[in-house]
A protein has these predicted regions:
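Charge-rich, well-structured scaffold segments of protease-associated domains
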Residues: 1-83, 157-272
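Basic side chains
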Residues: 2, 98, 149-152, 210
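Generic alpha-helical structural context detector
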Residues: 14-15, 133, 137, 146, ...
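Intrinsically disordered, low-complexity segments enriched in polar/charged residues with Gly/Pro
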Residues: 20, 42, 86-89, 133-135, ...
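His/Glu-based metal-binding/catalytic segments typifying zinc-dependent metallopeptidases
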Residues: 82-143
Length: 272
């Protein structure tokens, strides 16, 4: 992994988001693995059903038959134990801009920016956030891709997104990233920051973004086992309805001005 630029960059991103202790560092050392008793791991596997848990099922059985099968084969204690608290990794705040550099001998640089927006999940802003992402930093028709790669040739890849939390306790995070040649770094970083803060306005690009998001919502299907996970994901965010309903309905009446106003409030002038 140390010889892979992408892996090194991924660890740098984890450090930038969480600090010295992150999900990426939650690993056993070689000494800990060597000294570990294998039977302890086997016992942990055997004891998993003694903790509180949910059973997810997708298949042809009726609820009656399924419950009969579970009662017959899923052996658990009469009283289940609470799940032990796991490690918590909080996003670092970004009150001032800080630059982290990880030297790596390569022909191109990876540059990313992370800003903790310090705002919790809000279903009311999800439609405009999704449309902003589609317009500004999404696919090949987005402002970032067109400006950084197609028009100026300053990056191999470029994207930007306001990433929504997966749980209510986490904040929204603004994340941007480019990969470019070493000799284009200064121009690429300068231009990238300029379009992030002074977002170009294009009615044509907005129409492509709106139509693209609308068409994707029209044709997207959540099927089979994904239905269960979509339901659980909604529950994790305190929701009991499919968020795509509001997303689809709300974006139909949105204009480029809505995107511009959102960008000024949520993105312009951020520290990373």
């Amino acid at each position: 992994a140390k010889l892979n630029q992408g892996q090194n960059f991924s660890r740098l991103m984890s450090f930038a988001m969480y600090g010295p202790k992150s999900p990426a560092t939650n690993l056993l050392t070689e000494a800990e693995l060597t000294n570990m008793n294998p039977q302890e791991l086997v016992d942990r596997i055997h004891n998993q059903n003694s903790y509180k848990h949910r059973i997810l099922y997708y298949g042809p059985s009726s609820s009656k038959d399924l419950l009969a099968t579970i009662n017959q084969y899923h052996q658990v204690p009469a009283v289940l134990k609470d799940i032990p608290a796991g490690n918590e990794y909080a996003y670092l705040e970004t009150p001032v801009t800080k630059v982290l550099v990880a030297p790596y001998d390569a022909k191109q640089i990876y540059m990313a920016q992370i800003s903790n927006l310090d705002k919790k999940y809000d279903p009311a802003i999800e439609p405009i956030r999704a449309l902003y992402d589609e317009y500004f930093g999404g696919g090949m028709n987005s402002i970032v891709f067109q400006e950084m790669r197609e028009t100026r040739g300053l990056a191999y890849s470029a994207w930007a997104s306001i990433m929504p939390p997966s749980y209510l306790k986490y904040p929204y995070v603004l994340r941007t990233q480019i990969a470019t040649q070493n000799d284009k770094m200064i121009d690429a970083v300068t231009t990238f920051n300029d379009i992030i803060n002074n977002m170009p306005e294009s009615e044509a690009a907005f129409k492509l973004a709106k139509d693209g998001l609308t068409n994707r919502l029209r044709t997207e299907r959540i099927i089979k086992g994904d239905i269960i996970w979509s339901y659980i994901n909604a529950q994790d965010l305190g929701q009991n309805v499919d968020p795509r309903i509001k997303l689809y309905n709300d974006i139909q009446n949105m204009s480029l001005k809505d995107i511009v106003d959102f960008q000024k409030q949520w993105v312009k002038g951020r520290t990373y």
